[in-house]
Amino acid sequence: MTNMDKLYEAVEARGPVCVGLDTDFSYLPEDFVDSTLSRGENIVRFNKKLIDATKAVAGCYKVQIAYYESLGLEGMKAYADTLKAVREVGVPVIADIKRGDIAKTAEMYAMGHFTGDFESDFVTLAPYMGLDSISPYLPYAEKQGKGMFVLCRTSNGGAKDFEYEKLADGRHVYDLVGDKLNALGKDYMGEHGYSSIGLVIGGTHIEEATEIRAKYRDSFFLIPGYGAQGGKAEDIAQYLTKGNGGVVNSSRGILLAYKKQPGTAFDEAAYNECVNMKEAIAHACSLL
């Protein structure tokens, strides 16, 4: 069974919410911070409480490495400890690293994030140097069932600068990327009909959503953009297949939910936000 199979089953069991642990130190409630500990240690305490509170309603977690790199060595220890904390509760974890290099460098990235202190179940990758920026990760998919989510049509406004450009044959650049990755992924299919090579498909741009889902039916989607970036449940539902086939990420919306729920502890507020998000997406899917 591949990690993508396990993610599919996690979504079946708990829903498609992907909790983004993009944890900036400034997000921590002032009364939670222990002044005797480092920023990294406080972030790990925060993350662990949030993981424990949301693990029953989270399909997976996504840990954005930049928030940890910015703190230097203590941050990288916090990153490793956070990945470990997620893996210990048995929920799939995505390392949001967006690597995009080639050859030996990519081999080292793959080794660094699929083994050792920073081991994760999935990584995010940038494809624009070509398929040789993806291939060094594939042995880990073949031998260990590891998975990857490759940027295809992203949720940021600047996506239209490159991804939406038209090719001579009428396709967009994101179509070309998706087509090539979809073809490559057919050699790495799992038991539930999804490839180990997933796609990052932003939930803020809904143009041709139904066509994208139909065209890449073998590809599991990582769908950013919900909540703080403006993505709505009724739009995002179009990228799912009967409520599965993708995970929907929310980071700030969950991490900072306590600010919209006065008097509620941050971990309880995060749980409430996950439940609300899960129910909203399920309702939207039921209307399709």
Indicate where each model-derived feature is located.
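Active-site beta-loop-alpha junctions enriched in small/polar residues
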Residues: 22-26, 66-68, 98-102, 128, ...
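A C-terminal functional module that forms or caps the active site or interfaces directly
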Residues: 199, 203-249, 253-257
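Active-site-adjacent beta->alpha loops and helix N-cap segments on the catalytic face
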Residues: 70-85, 102-107, 129-142, 204-213, ...
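Surface-exposed amphipathic alpha-helices with a cationic face
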Residues: 8-12, 83-87, 138-142, 182-186, ...
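Glycine-enriched alpha-helix->loop->beta-strand junction motifs that scaffold or abut catalytic
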Residues: 13, 58, 115-121, 142-148, ...
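Conserved anion-binding
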Residues: 97, 101-198
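Conserved N-terminal beta1-alpha1 strand-loop-helix module at the mouth
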Residues: 1-63, 68-81, 85-92, 262, ...
